[in-house]
Amino acid sequence: MKLEQFDFKYMPALVERVYNLWTPPQAEEKFRWIYAESIIRQDMHANNMQFQLTENGQIMAIACASRKGEKNSAGPWWNEQFSKLSDEQKISFNMGREYIAYMDKKTFAFMNENDVKLDMFISTKKGWRKKLLDKAISFFKQAGFENLFLWTDEECNVDWYINHNYELVNEDIYELFSSEEDYKTYVFKMKLE
């Protein structure tokens, strides 16, 4: 099992994994596919921390990370997709982009130059998330990073982070996604010792 740089040939398998979790259920299928892919791409950067684990030619897990202030590499792809959407779809597509940018900026505000941000991790099979995170964390330590940061929201298993040595550094409400209920967001930190 070797930690490798992400190969985009595995993008369809990742989109398929998150399709029902990360997309507006009432939207048409083609838009949902593009929307899910846009979330993944907006968490990728042009650096050496876009990791994958594969087994027998299949993607098992990916993790993408960035340094403080790094911008994602989705721009050209995102703009091309955006230009093909209806006006209503553009609003939804842009809301997703703005949310990710907002949470990235918020997380960067807690970071120093020797910290790393885990932008995303996806596993396609049970047990592979831990395998990948262990390898990625080892890489981050060897690279000299001091702390690992990540953000998440109420749609994820927030208790998992608390139970795995992550410190909650910020809990907030994202007003644009709130209705009768507040939409909660979280920023976590883990010391890389």
What are these regions (language model features)?
Residues 48-52, 62, 120, 185-187:
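Short hydrophobic/aromatic beta-strand element in the GNAT-like acyltransferase core
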Residues 162-171:
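Conserved acetyl-CoA-binding loop of GNAT-fold acetyltransferases
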Residues 124-140, 163:
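Conserved acetyl-CoA-binding loop-helix of GNAT-fold acetyltransferases
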Residues 1-16, 28:
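A short beta-loop-alpha structural element at the N-terminal edge
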Residues 118-125, 149-159, 174-179:
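Conserved beta-strand-loop-alpha-helix junction that forms the acyl-donor binding cleft
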Residues 27-56, 64-70:
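Active-site rim helix/loop that mediates acceptor-substrate recognition in acyltransferases
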Residues 112-117, 140-153:
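Conserved GNAT acetyl-CoA-binding A-motif
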Residues 64-120, 176-181:
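Conserved acyl-donor/pantetheine-binding loop and adjacent beta-alpha core of acyl/acetyltransferases
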